[in-house]
Amino acid sequence: VLSSADKNNVKACWGKIGSHAGEYGAEALERTFCSFPTTKTYFPHFDLSHGSAQVQTHGQKVADALTKAVAHINDLPNALSDLSDLHAYKLRVDPVNFKFLSHCLLVTLACHHPEEFTPAVHASLDKFFSAVSTVLTSKYR
């Protein structure tokens, strides 16, 4: 459960990301594909090379979903319901992949914002990404 301090940390950190969210989303996806090659199986139609337009576009989608989640941090299930349906019923993404992407998002944010990435912010973002992952996998059976 996200505490008030966690929510404040997440909002403050995400606010500093600003216009770089899509760039960081794409970088985190690239890290995920490199570090966890089995994740590539969900994107057989993508050009997964560094900087590809398809990875950039999907990175922006990831960033947009996380931006929406931050904006609705007190009601993640309703905010992410459509995305949860998509991943559970249509895409059927293995839930472990959300953990992989979450880890790569943390690494990416730490690389770009080391001064803001305190232990408290790290813990808050980790809890937030975990909460988002839980919502996205809540409709799996």
From Swiss-Prot:
<feature type="binding site" description="proximal binding residue">
    <location>
        <position position="87"/>
    </location>
    <ligand>
        <name>heme b</name>
    </ligand>
</feature>
<dbReference type="InterPro" id="IPR012292">
    <property type="entry name" value="Globin/Proto"/>
</dbReference>
<feature type="modified residue" description="Phosphothreonine">
    <location>
        <position position="137"/>
    </location>
</feature>
<dbReference type="GO" id="GO:0005344">
    <property type="term" value="F:oxygen carrier activity"/>
</dbReference>
<keyword id="KW-0349">Heme</keyword>
<protein>
    <recommendedName>
        <fullName>Hemoglobin subunit alpha</fullName>
    </recommendedName>
</protein>
<dbReference type="GO" id="GO:0043177">
    <property type="term" value="F:organic acid binding"/>
</dbReference>
<dbReference type="InterPro" id="IPR000971">
    <property type="entry name" value="Globin"/>
</dbReference>
<feature type="modified residue" description="Phosphoserine">
    <location>
        <position position="3"/>
    </location>
</feature>
<feature type="modified residue" description="Phosphoserine">
    <location>
        <position position="35"/>
    </location>
</feature>
<feature type="modified residue" description="N6-succinyllysine">
    <location>
        <position position="11"/>
    </location>
</feature>
<dbReference type="InterPro" id="IPR002338">
    <property type="entry name" value="Hemoglobin_a-typ"/>
</dbReference>
<dbReference type="GO" id="GO:0019825">
    <property type="term" value="F:oxygen binding"/>
</dbReference>
<feature type="modified residue" description="Phosphothreonine">
    <location>
        <position position="108"/>
    </location>
</feature>
<feature type="modified residue" description="N6-succinyllysine; alternate">
    <location>
        <position position="16"/>
    </location>
</feature>
<dbReference type="Pfam" id="PF00042">
    <property type="entry name" value="Globin"/>
</dbReference>
<feature type="modified residue" description="Phosphoserine">
    <location>
        <position position="102"/>
    </location>
</feature>
<dbReference type="GO" id="GO:0020037">
    <property type="term" value="F:heme binding"/>
</dbReference>
<feature type="domain" description="Globin">
    <location>
        <begin position="1"/>
        <end position="141"/>
    </location>
</feature>
<feature type="binding site">
    <location>
        <position position="58"/>
    </location>
    <ligand>
        <name>O2</name>
    </ligand>
</feature>
<keyword id="KW-0007">Acetylation</keyword>
<comment type="similarity">
    <text>Belongs to the globin family.</text>
</comment>
<keyword id="KW-0813">Transport</keyword>
<dbReference type="InterPro" id="IPR050056">
    <property type="entry name" value="Hemoglobin_oxygen_transport"/>
</dbReference>
<feature type="modified residue" description="Phosphotyrosine">
    <location>
        <position position="24"/>
    </location>
</feature>
<feature type="modified residue" description="Phosphoserine">
    <location>
        <position position="49"/>
    </location>
</feature>
<comment type="subunit">
    <text>Heterotetramer of two alpha chains and two beta chains.</text>
</comment>
<feature type="modified residue" description="Phosphothreonine">
    <location>
        <position position="134"/>
    </location>
</feature>
<feature type="modified residue" description="N6-succinyllysine">
    <location>
        <position position="40"/>
    </location>
</feature>
<comment type="function">
    <text>Involved in oxygen transport from the lung to the various peripheral tissues.</text>
</comment>
<dbReference type="InterPro" id="IPR009050">
    <property type="entry name" value="Globin-like_sf"/>
</dbReference>
<feature type="modified residue" description="Phosphoserine">
    <location>
        <position position="138"/>
    </location>
</feature>
<keyword id="KW-0561">Oxygen transport</keyword>
<dbReference type="GO" id="GO:0031720">
    <property type="term" value="F:haptoglobin binding"/>
</dbReference>
<keyword id="KW-0408">Iron</keyword>
<feature type="modified residue" description="N6-succinyllysine">
    <location>
        <position position="7"/>
    </location>
</feature>
<dbReference type="GO" id="GO:0005833">
    <property type="term" value="C:hemoglobin complex"/>
</dbReference>
<dbReference type="GO" id="GO:0004601">
    <property type="term" value="F:peroxidase activity"/>
</dbReference>
<dbReference type="InterPro" id="IPR002339">
    <property type="entry name" value="Hemoglobin_pi"/>
</dbReference>
<keyword id="KW-0479">Metal-binding</keyword>
<feature type="modified residue" description="Phosphoserine">
    <location>
        <position position="124"/>
    </location>
</feature>
<keyword id="KW-0597">Phosphoprotein</keyword>
